[in-house]
Amino acid sequence: NVVMDRAFPVIRDRILENNTPVVDSVTAATFSSYGVKAAVADAMAQAGLEVEDITMTTAGPEKEAKTLEDVTADIVVVGGGPSGLAAAITAKQTKEDVNVIVVEKMDILSGNGKFDMNFYDLINSEAQKAAGNEQWTVNQVENFIEAKSSAGDSPERVKVWAEQENVLDAWLRDMGVNLDYNYGAMNHMAKEDQYAGEVIQAGMEECARDLGIDIRTGTKGLDLIMEDGRCTGVTVENNDNESYGIKAQYTIIATGGFCSSKELLGEYAP
């Protein structure tokens, strides 16, 4: 299970460390956390031990607020989904000794990306070649760009997307992410019965950790640090109610959530 595989180690450790199932749920895995906590509480009750009823809102005691010393990095990425991990991995692959920190407010990475069934509109992929599908010509790519361009998706963005898809496919394959099931012309899954998002996220997470990227889950960005009109990092707060600053030469915002902002939608996609 794409959620439970990530959530179980976190909720297990919390229960063992506190010697009780009355602990905070894993953010982004509320139902999975509830199932584990309820099962532990039931086992304790059957053993004759006292434990309070477990509900969907059961949480551990509130932690005292603390302010920690600031840390430094070359690059800090806010958001641990596919785009944030892609930025962090690319930075590390480009310059091996660069110090990269990724902060993600949820306890597990990816957000909704891990639930994506398809990788849409992948052009001239290895899976298409293996299936014997005719490779797109320059004219076909240009027609695709024209058809996909709209007020909400500029021709410039679509052009980069269309012309670099095969490069992206090769990049993913280099980290063991093989989208080998091609159907419906440009739709791709890992296998016929395996979603693309699950495999992409797992491969990117493994690659990021192998590269030595500092990934801090349960850590939300609070505000940008601005000095003389320039962003020099971000202030964060973790699940232990500890806040601190991450000072960095470069700050990358990859939090998503654009469609939840009425103001941004009104300005850029009316």
Located regions from the model:
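Active-site- and interface-proximal helix/loop "cap" or "latch" segments in soluble metabolic
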Residues: 1-58
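Glycine-rich, acidic and aromatic/proline-enriched surface loops and short helix-turn segments
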Residues: 13, 174-177, 253-260
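A conserved short coil-to-beta-strand element within the FAD-binding core of flavoproteins
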Residues: 217-231
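Glycine-rich loop(s) and the adjacent beta-strand/alpha-helix scaffold that form part
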Residues: 241, 249-270
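A short, basic/flexible loop-to-alpha-helix module at the beginning of a structural domain
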Residues: 54-72
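Conserved N-terminal/central alpha/beta ligand/cofactor-binding core
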Residues: 99, 105-214, 263-270
